Amino acid sequence: MNGTRLAVAATIVLWLTTPSHAQDAGSRAAGVAPQPPKSLKVAAVQFRSCRDLDKNVAGITSQIRRLAKEGVRVAVFPECALTGYFEDVVKTTTAEQLADAERRVANACREVGIYAVVGTPYRDGGKLYNSAAVIDPSGRVIERYHKIQLAESWPTPGDHLSVLRVDGVPCSVIICHDERYPELVRLPVLAGARVIFYLSHESGIRQESKLGPYRAQIQARAVENTVYVVHANAPANDDLSGSHGQSRVIAPDGNIFGEVSMFGEEVVTADLDLRRATAVNALNSLAQGPLTDWWKEGVKRVRIVEVGSPAPVESRR
């Protein structure tokens, strides 16, 4: 193993052995060395958004509360779940309306003590982003990822990749068209990520030529990096419009071990055995070949989200 691989491996070990807030505090109080989690229970929520922001919030928060009772630690919702993937609605929803809706979702996470990854437009300084808000069990937005590779004309492209902790597990986020770009997963994995949350509102089932590539691409991202992918997609509508569902959880060997239908508002849950997410295929690209230095420079551009650094989300209606 060369020096570059050692450096990245050290980063990954740090992320896998650094626990979440409660684990860390409890371990210090007991005088016991913290242990990394061995599993993570996740849910990919195939949520059907409508044009009514309040109804979407009600549906999302209802799922969060229900899934918490089932022991789920992180609930993942589709791209633009908060508003629906409707360009006119996205463009006319104000920053204040989005912030209020997000606060209500954050309240639900805080009340039941789980994480949520929610697709939402986000306005900042006159710019409009296609984003994912990662909310922790205290109701804090610990990361806000903006879609980088765009299929739409309305958003501003994002400018960063990130690695964040969910119950101490290093994770990253991509959105829909991002899946076509292998580096958007490979770089966060080299920076420590073991689970990728993938939010989408993919092409409708009438666009048959795209369905096979959609499946192949995201499975490739899992196996070529030896990590889990938790994919929340919007369902197809009865008139065959909208997306095409099939939300799924993909194992580090690329096989799908949980998937739902094309049309239903359904949820796929899974207990991820984190020992399987070794990132070995990603790390091999640092061990040999002409791109070692290139990957090393790319890893430096990944934002590492430190526990406790984000500002809290206001938790009142």
Predicted regions and their residues:
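CN hydrolase (nitrilase-like) catalytic-core segments centered on the catalytic cysteine
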Residues: 97-117, 170, 180-268
